[in-house]
Amino acid sequence: MAGHSKWANIKRQKAVVDAKKGKTFTQLSRAIILAARSGIPDPSGNFQLRTAIDKAKAAGIPNDNIERAIAKGAGTFGGDNASLEEIRYEGYGPGGVAILIEALTDNRNRTAADLRVAFSKNGGNLGETGCVSWMFDQKGVCVVSGVVDEDQLLEASLEGGAESYEMTEDETAEVFTEVANLEILNQTLKDQGFKVTDAELRWIPSNNVEVTEPDQARSLLKLIDTLEGLDDVQNVTSNFEMSENLMAVSFA
């Protein structure tokens, strides 16, 4: 899980930069619309909406934009947002790396076509539903920031029903739980004084594919970056493992 967490950390750092380009603004606004539509449009009673709003605020999205997205999801703003739907696509990257794409789109044909082009131009191929999803398990993940006492984290994690946790190298920890238990774990950690900076659903690979060849690494990371740059794509997950040095060189 370590390599996956490393990639997740890089993605969070990239999100701050991407926000300046407007890409993350669109993603997070759509996530708010969907959360408000699928539950009550009140964050106090809708955990999915509450976490989507927290992410939007962390990315610097203005409150007016957040309120507008909530209103769109609730159907009180106008415009046709009912056509937005969540779709998961699956495929393979260079070297047989498994890739899951979560999209939020109002035109699934357009989205599939864009994804197919991105895969084909970067050494991969878009597959059929189910071709790689069996290699992943969906989990709830709480990201805890700041100096963390591991014994206290273990105690709080057990109390909150966590399955496991992982200390990372940048003064953060990630605590994993079943999807249905994420809200309880999030609140338990906060009640115990931990600073939870993110609570999300994440696909965790059951097995990783080790990438050691520089050309393959560059092609793979370019593919993932291209996929994440598509307007309809909300999240991209893969099962590769790569050294920090190779990742840094490939991003350069």
Curated annotation (Swiss-Prot):
Pfam family, one: TACO1_YebC_N
GO CC terms of this entry: cytosol
UniProt-listed Gene3D superfamilies: 1.10.10.200, 3.30.70.980
Location relative to the cell: Cytoplasm
Keywords assigned by UniProt, alphabetized: Cytoplasm, DNA-binding, Transcription, Transcription regulation
Superkingdom of source: Bacteria
A GO BP entry: regulation of DNA-templated transcription
GO MF term (any one): DNA binding
InterPro entries attached to this UniProt entry: Integrase-like_N (IPR017856), TACO1_YebC-like_2nd/3rd_dom (IPR048300), TACO1_YebC_N (IPR049083), Transcrip_reg_TACO1-like (IPR002876), Transcrip_reg_TACO1-like_dom3 (IPR026564), YebC-like (IPR029072)
Keyword presence, Acetylation: no
NCBIfam families to which the protein is assigned, alphabetical: PRK00110.1, PRK12378.1, YebC/PmpR family DNA-binding transcriptional regulator
Family the entry assigns: Belongs to the TACO1 family.
Protein known as: Probable transcriptional regulatory protein Ava_1228
